[in-house]
């Protein structure tokens, strides 16, 4: 099963590899990603934004699709964000999209463009 995650942070493993900044929050996401990616029947792809050029790389059995723009893109430019979401869908061809929060533009834009792909939306901290 191919799963595409939409997250609002750069995971530490990929940040270290790219020399990028990461957040101290979201530890539960990291543990969940490690557990899911250990299943040989699952291909996990994580989409997010960071302050660098477009990257499509794999680290420790997790594929990362990183779009340029960092924090600004999390909040603004919905047309470009929708294009990025479409590109991630084309690259990953997921069986399921899992959006971790809708407080930023990527989660909302993915909901609008994902078509017939089933979506799981997780909201935490209520």
Task: Please state what every model-predicted region is.
Residues 53-59, 110-113:
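Short loop/helix-cap segments at secondary-structure boundaries that form the rim of catalytic
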Residues 1-52, 62, 117:
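N-terminal subdomain of nucleotide-sugar transferases
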Residues 113-126:
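Charged, glycine-enriched surface loops/patches
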Residues 8, 69, 123-126:
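Histidine-centered beta-alpha loop that forms part of the nucleotide-sugar donor binding/catalytic region
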């Amino acid at each position: 099963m191919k799963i595409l995650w939409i997250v609002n942070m750069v995971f530490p493993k990929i940040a270290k590899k790219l020399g990028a900044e990461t957040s101290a929050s979201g530890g539960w996401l990291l543990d969940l990603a490690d557990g899911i990616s250990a299943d040989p029947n699952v291909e996990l792809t994580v989409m997010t934004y960071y302050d660098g050029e477009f990257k499509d790389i794999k680290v420790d059995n997790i594929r990362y699709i990183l779009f340029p723009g960092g924090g600004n893109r999390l909040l603004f430019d919905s047309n470009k964000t929708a294009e990025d979401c479409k590109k991630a869908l084309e690259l990953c061809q997921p069986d399921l999209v899992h959006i971790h929060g809708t407080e930023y533009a990527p989660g909302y834009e993915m909901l609008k463009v994902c078509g017939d792909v089933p979506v799981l939306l997780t909201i935490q901290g209520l």
